[in-house]
Amino acid sequence: MQLFDVDLFSSAGVPEMPANVVRGPEKTLRELATEGFAVPTLNVMHSDTRMENPVIHCYNQSQMQQMQAYAKAAGIELKVWVAKPGLSNDYLVSLVGGRIIASVGSNAKCQQMTKADPLKRVKKAILRDVAARLGRKCTDDDIVSLIGTRFDESVQRERKMSERGESAFEAVNLAADAGGHDWVLSPIAEMTTMDVFSYIGQVIAGRIECYDRFNQLVEIYRDMNGGDCMVNVYLAGKQSERPACGHRTGCWSCTRVSRDSSAESMIAKEGGEYDWLKPLNDLRNYIKARHFDPSARCWLARTIDKETGTIKIAPNSYSPAFTKELLGIMLTIQLDEFDAAQQAGIKPRFTLLDIQQLLAVEALWGRYGYQKPFTAMRVFLEVYEQGVRYEIPDIAALPKYTEADLRYPEVEVPFCDDQYQGMFNGLRSISHAAADAEFLTTTRSGMVVMDVVTSSGFEIDREGAELFVNFELDNALSRVTFDQSPTAGLHYLMGLGTIAIYKGDHGDWDRMMRMSNQIFRSDLQPILHDRAALIARLGGSSLGQIDLF
């Protein structure tokens, strides 16, 4: 009898996750082991977006420990894999760094960045691990993934599951149409929400053996629903037609829904148990409130017409001023949490941006010409050492913005000057060249650029980041001044080897740094949020909103 290695996706803090684990592989594997079969390793794969509701994040950590302890006692070989986004897919870094905007409505880019891509990467690592243990080359056909999706979750989920052909009884190849292999089994696909809650109740009552009793899970769901028992909430019909991300716990930063009712219920709990979550919810609401604000957007596109040297004026990522404000707010919230945790004698319950993420924001600001050199580090010092606070404005006092406020015709204007293609205008540092301290390479397009450190993705070396902040930062702030281009700070960090770019991505960094330097020479940074000012500065002409009709 051939047994596949089992790869289990675990959901983030929903009942489907424990039900899937217990009903599916662990009990079956234990029975097979008792009958003398060689039992494959159970690989539990968990997704950590780095933005989960902190209460759920803490709960998930304890659940993974419980699973490991249960598996060890049952004689089951179990490995837990945690899929986290790298800096290239880090949602907060990309948002504050000026690379993306928040996902709203049906936009699911956040899910692709923080869950889908990291899970694919970890699944490949599992495949390599399986191959090493079996001593032979393995393919995707050697792994079956068990996932906790259910037809009853929502109308949208039922439609997507049906389109994929998911089944509770037979593994299906989701990649068959593309000629690939992605075998998936959905053990609880046919379970209703009441079935899940009933199952959890049986475990709590001790009638079903499980790796956990789920008492804490019930408490969390009760707090999410304003003190109501989760079963009563369902019977009352409050969740019968919930949309995606509705009454679930998810990312504290999620702006795909109008309001985070789960977090609000937790914050409103008597006794103030979850008061510390309010700043995160307030920040989430502020980002959503400013999303369609024209002054919170950068109006300069990121692609230049190579033949004409022109560029389009259209709403892009968030503006330099707004992203700087967001960084200050996040660091203020984070410092408040660190101080509160120290006073309470506990570990901080969340961290928004660590030192690697902070330097990644610094690098992106230099790449996009968003701020003067080392502005992110200066904001960090303001908050952490100088007592400066960035408070969230009163959202009720803000105008109500909609997508229509960004609806202007695209305008193409001159952008590149005669220095744009200069030797040291992109990914080359004149300071390093003058000191004979640069190593060069050639891009696929024939450009000669600095041969900086490369890796499997955009990365900030942790040890290098800590050494930079502790020993080199003061020197960097004195040597790299505000009258230099934003790329000066980027060159500084690249020269230290603190930043690693994706291998083969030299050309793209060279292109964006040329644009960054052009923004600096044209003095566009202060007006990147102002569409009319950009058009006037760059010499284009424009139609106003009224001319659209």
Q: Which residues are covered by each model-predicted region?
A:
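Nucleotide-activated chemistry modules centered on ATP-dependent adenylation/adenylyltransferase
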Residues: M1-F549
